[in-house]
Regions:
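Positively charged n-region of N-terminal signal peptides that target proteins for export
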Residues: 1-4
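Short acidic/polar inter-strand loop motif in beta-rich domains
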Residues: 141-152
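Exposed aromatic-hydrophobic patches
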Residues: 121-128
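Bacterial N-terminal signal peptides
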Residues: 8-16
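Short amphipathic, basic-aromatic surface patches that mediate peripheral association
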Residues: 56, 69-88
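A short tyrosine-centered beta-strand micro-motif
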Residues: 132-139
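Solvent-exposed serine/threonine-rich low-complexity stretches and specific carbohydrate-binding patches
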Residues: 108-116
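Short, compositionally biased P/S/T/A/G/V-rich stretches that sit at domain boundaries
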Residues: 23-63
């Protein structure tokens, strides 16, 4: 029994050491745009970017190679009629984005993928993008588009008896000065 506890203690110490090393070798997130955190519909959202990352399954993700950065939207639910937990991540969203330069010309567009990292679930993607100043607009579509259902009966139903929103919610971050810091 004593050996078990010694081994357990050693394993715990190794885990803590590995975590500390991972923290030291970490990376920096850069805030995207001048708006910072925004209230969008029933959610609080913020955007960051950092170096491109490997993701799995790789056939569903934009590859690290050929990408200049990873963009990420972190979001949590506020009080809402859909019964998403307050301060929890909102699943089943489809989030499209359009990136424009300072002259309003579209330079890149795509979709954010739902994913998880060491800091939790989010929507993001690797993208190619030249250094410069940009505006990014997100178009957040209802979870119903991905087959997410709501109970609407009197006994078990959510507050939102009419279902989800029908037009995409939008959020824009301006004055984003993208500089490759890595």
């Amino acid at each position: 029994m004593k050996k078990f506890f010694v081994l357990l203690l050693a394993a715990m110490m190794l885990s803590v050491s590995a975590f500390a090393l991972a923290e030291e070798a970490g990376f920096d997130e850069y805030e995207l745009g001048v708006e910072g955190e925004q209230e969008v519909g029933f959610m609080t959202m913020s955007m960051v970017y950092f170096q491109p990352v490997d993701m799995a399954p790789s056939d569903l993700a934009a590859p690290k190679e050929g990408s200049d950065l990873h963009i990420e939207v972190d979001l949590t639910a506020n009080e809402n009629p859909y019964s998403f937990p307050v301060d929890g991540w909102v699943p089943y969203l489809s989030i499209d984005y359009v990136i424009k330069d300072t002259e309003g010309k579209e330079v890149y567009s795509g979709s954010m993928m739902p994913m998880a990292a060491s800091d939790g679930p989010h929507y993001g993607n690797n993208i190619p993008l030249a250094e410069g100043e940009y505006t990014i607009t997100l178009y957040i579509k209802s979870p119903a588009e991905n087959g997410y259902l709501l109970h609407v009966d009197a006994e078990t139903g959510v507050e939102a008896r009419d279902g989800f929103w029908t037009e995409p919610l939008t959020a824009t971050w301006t004055g984003w000065k993208f500089v490759k810091e890595w």
